[in-house]
Amino acid sequence: MLTIYAVSDSIGETAEQVSKATARQFKERVDVKRVTYIRTFEAVDDFINSIKDPENSMLISTVVLVDIREFLVERCIERGIRIVNVLGPCISTASRVLKTTPTYEPGAVWNMDDRYYKKIEAMEFAMRYDDSKDYNGIKHADVILIGLSRTSKTPLCMYLANKGIKALNVPIMPEIPIPEELFEVDRTKLVGLTIDPIRLIEIRKHRMNKFNQLSSEIQYANGERVLEELEYADKIMRRLRCKIIDVTNRAIEDTALLIMEAIGYNGFRES
């Protein structure tokens, strides 16, 4: 089940209507919850911290207050929550056509510099190719993360996107061949993610318990299966001769820093 949070710094009607229109496109259950008058950093923190299932949640935001909007995006990235700003592209396009700067409440002027657009482009890229079987993005990525399920690939891609880095992730499973495209790209763009087997089992068991998947995915957290996956992933990473980073008990920010160092990132990514 997906929960869409319609977030606004006003009454939230627009965000809710867009959220409901989105939900109606799917047969699966999608809940829509309106979150209104998000106008302070404290309100953002309280709201984001209240989300119990980040992986199965997304935000559709119409927040226009710049500081609050930026902070909301940062907090979403920290928790691996996907966010879509509805008004941003509309206002930006109108502004370019009118050749003028849009105004909001005092001090709330939309940041339309080159870095902002690169960040948005990178975030859209990360969401488009997240755990995807569409590998067309590999040749356009600044970094390609490869690793087993539950090695933080998605939140890392979103965090890197906030730095303007186009990050794509490729899941590794013994039953599924890795794409040949990985052998054709500059290997300095490849980063393998590994993890301690005991920690990986804990993470997977926690996920299974949360979604009551003990019967259908019993092998997912089985010790022998996890060791088999890790051994297979290690062989793949060595074949690719890529940088390998251990994410065990490491914060997203710390792992992202190591990734940025590995690819030679020393500032906002330029095209």
Curated annotation (Swiss-Prot):
Top-level taxonomic group: Bacteria
Positions of disulphide bridges: none
Taxonomic source organism: Clostridium tetani (strain Massachusetts / E88)
MF terms in GO: ADP binding; ATP binding; phosphotransferase activity, phosphate group as acceptor; protein serine/threonine kinase activity
InterPro entries recorded: Kinase-pyrophosphorylase, PPDK_reg
Protein name, entry field: Putative pyruvate, phosphate dikinase regulatory protein
Keyword Membrane on entry: no
Catalytic activity, reaction form: N(tele)-phospho-L-histidyl/L-threonyl-[pyruvate, phosphate dikinase] + ADP = N(tele)-phospho-L-histidyl/O-phospho-L-threonyl-[pyruvate, phosphate dikinase] + AMP + H(+); N(tele)-phospho-L-histidyl/O-phospho-L-threonyl-[pyruvate, phosphate dikinase] + phosphate + H(+) = N(tele)-phospho-L-histidyl/L-threonyl-[pyruvate, phosphate dikinase] + diphosphate
The UniProt record lists the keyword Cytoplasm: no
Sequence positions that bind ADP: 147-154
Enzyme nomenclature, EC number: 2.7.11.32, 2.7.4.27
PANTHER family per the UniProt record, alphabetical: PYRUVATE, PHOSPHATE DIKINASE REGULATORY PROTEIN 1, CHLOROPLASTIC
Family listed: Belongs to the pyruvate, phosphate/water dikinase regulatory protein family. PDRP subfamily.
Enzyme class: transferase
Keywords: Kinase, Nucleotide-binding, Serine/threonine-protein kinase, Transferase
Annotated function: Bifunctional serine/threonine kinase and phosphorylase involved in the regulation of the pyruvate, phosphate dikinase (PPDK) by catalyzing its phosphorylation/dephosphorylation.
